[in-house]
From Swiss-Prot:
Signal peptide boundaries: none
Broad class of enzyme this protein falls into: transferase
Subunit structure: Homodimer.
Protein name as it appears in the record: Acetate kinase
Role summary: Catalyzes the formation of acetyl phosphate from acetate and ATP. Can also catalyze the reverse reaction.
Gene name per UniProt: ackA
Lineage, top ranks: Bacteria, Bacillati, Actinomycetota, Actinomycetes, Mycobacteriales
Amino acid sequence: MAYVLVLNSGSSSVKFQLVDPESSATDTPLVSGLVEQVGEPQGAVTVKTGGEEFKEELEIPTHSFGLDRAFSIMHEHGVGPTDVEVIAVGHRVVHGGRLFSEPQLIVDQIESMIEDLIPLAPLHNPANLDGIRVARKLLPEIPHVAVFDTAFFNHMPPAAALYAINNDVASQYDIRRYGFHGTSHEFVSQQVPKLLDRDPGHVHQITLHLGNGASAAAIRNGRPIDTSMGLTPLAGLAMGTRSGDIDPGIIFHLSREAGMSIDEIDNLLNKRSGVKGIAGVNDFRVLRERINNEDQDAWLAYNIYIHQLRRFIGAYMIALGRVDAITFTAGVGENDTEVRQDSLYNLDMYGIDFDKEANLVRSKEPRMISTADSQVKVFVVPTNEELAIAQKSAGIAAMAREAGLY
């Protein structure tokens, strides 16, 4: 059996999975794991395989050291990159800018182009690039593929993609709506026509990726026409720690009146806002407990979250003209029954006949939570970004081999 090693490299961590690209979305990967606290005195490498977990706590000075140690632990249990057939290494890259609309076989030139995009994603692309460079050195004989979070949204209509600011400034500094969570939105949106038993080219849908980060997308006939995140993942819905859309004048006000620096405002809006900024927590399970205990801040945070979500659902229903399906995915979207119910409350006049009993069913399988005769079908579809990356990477790797590059 052939596998793809999927890597998601952060500034102080590396998540990894060995995935069969032919598997289904609910199948367990052969290996999953995490290298954490890179550069800190107390790091750890965790490897899960065959229903068992193996964890080693140690200092991890670099990404290279941590990933090499992870491969060694995998090898000790017969599932290392040299023990099984690995046909590709797929790398999640957050920002592809205008340069990348499709996955790319990684060569030195592609590395340089990803580096050129660092100003658009200063927190994410450097870490993604570190992971690419480390993995290419450790596994030089295997094709490496970059899969970009922004790629799915790269051809949105100009009216949705561009901001109403000076053209010259926007062009000079690459300012536009790029969108994020693209791999997830694309993956989920491809499952919906199968559930509807419809041609993908004739489905209008809204996808809602609701995790700690959250985004919405309007997709017409397989192509996105709008999305909630923008130049950065800060825009759009209220999220776990991010503000989502705000009046840009708030930034000037905080600078002038509070004397806050750009970095301080950046930290406030990205890490100390959203649900956490209002309620003090961003775990929706804890938030629900506090709401049940009549915590007013928790109730306010939840209401703002739902209000923003309903605003985008309504806007995208208008943008699409006809909506065949609304789909919830990611941690909150897949597991929080009340978020799903409250976000679609009292929308029967718009063709949404919500099934409260179906909504309460717990399952890892895709499922419908509207009634059978609802004009707009509502689904819960578990996302699997790693599988999507594996599938895209396997395809690019196959073409590279056919071209004699490997």
